[in-house]
Amino acid sequence: GINVLSDKPMAINSQSFKLLEECFAIAKQKNIMLYDIMTERNEITTMLQRELSTIPAVYGEQLKGSPEEPAIVKESVHHLFKLVDNKPLTRPVWYLDVNQQGEGIVDVTTHLVDLVQWEAFPDQIIDYKKDIELIDANRWTTSISPEEFKQVTGTDAYPDFLKKDVENDTLKVYCNGDIVYKIKGVTAKVSVIWNYTFPKGGGDTHFSVMKGSKADLVIRQGKEQNYQPELFVEAVKGVDLAAYEKDLTASMEKVSAEYPGVALNKVGDGVWQVEIPAKYRVGHEAHFGQVTEHFLDYLKEGKLPDWEVPNMLAKYYTTTSALDMAKAKK
């Protein structure tokens, strides 16, 4: 058998989820590893958000939330056409075929669902049969004109396999989706939106919040942050701010022992920005190398951490069941 380090998504619908379960069973039997590439766990703002959420003096207890007010939210906005190193990014034509790439609700959401699990339940096993409860799921299309199609793929005409998604010359791709669900009793929401492109000076955006009884840990990546993710600690109403600031400052000293240079900057009443030195912002491409290093360590040890396989299954169960739920809506 072959050890496999796979790009996400490993499953894009319920059928492939069943197949994935079989693959994990075979891997276990043959003592080989099957692992997906979760680059976003190596993004520094996410690592620090996770770290701070494990410190009761900073975070308090994880709130349970509700469908109207989820206690964990992760939303990202991506763009089909963009410049990478000042050159237009050309995407393969099949990238726009949901039967090959997967719909948005089962593609990039894989990362967001992974982070909900990894941050809120670190090193804990999640059993999808009893720990996951879907509440709501939606999917919708992004329209791409023939000119835009040519610009992003470099191809003149829609191939036959995309004709199913063309209406009046416009390609409609189901690349957007959101999922509201409960994981071990905590209500979470993930959402992925793909627009065609962004206005000049714009970029991909990300928003994430984890809500604790003492503070919200918020990642913002928007215009104000120059499209670079930044982490904020926002004390909840009713907290004694003077006492909280002492606790937060003391806790940050422990964090900066592990991440030298990371510091707090008070930006408002009960609001602090976590200052992150540039050396920690290694960029998306470097994360692939970091994931590979982890995988090679696991190969040396001869096993994945106990929680990884059940949690991969929980993750793909969540995304593929959400697709079924969203498709069932008319």
Sequence positions of predicted segments:
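Hydrophobic residues in alpha-helical segments
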Residues: 24-28, 53, 299-302
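Predominantly a Rossmann-like dinucleotide-binding segment in NAD(P)-dependent oxidoreductases
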Residues: 29-36, 40-168, 295, 329
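Contiguous C-terminal substrate-recognition/catalytic subdomains in enzyme active sites
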Residues: 167-170, 224
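C-terminal helical cap and adjacent loop that interface with cofactors, partners, or active-site loops
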Residues: 107, 112, 116-117, 124, ...
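Conserved structured core elements
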Residues: 14-18, 43, 110, 173, ...
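Short secondary-structure boundary/capping segments
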Residues: 21, 50-57, 224-228
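Glycine- and acidic
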Residues: 5-6, 36, 79, 95-102, ...
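Beta-strand-loop-alpha-helix segment that lines the small-molecule cofactor/substrate pocket
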Residues: 1-41
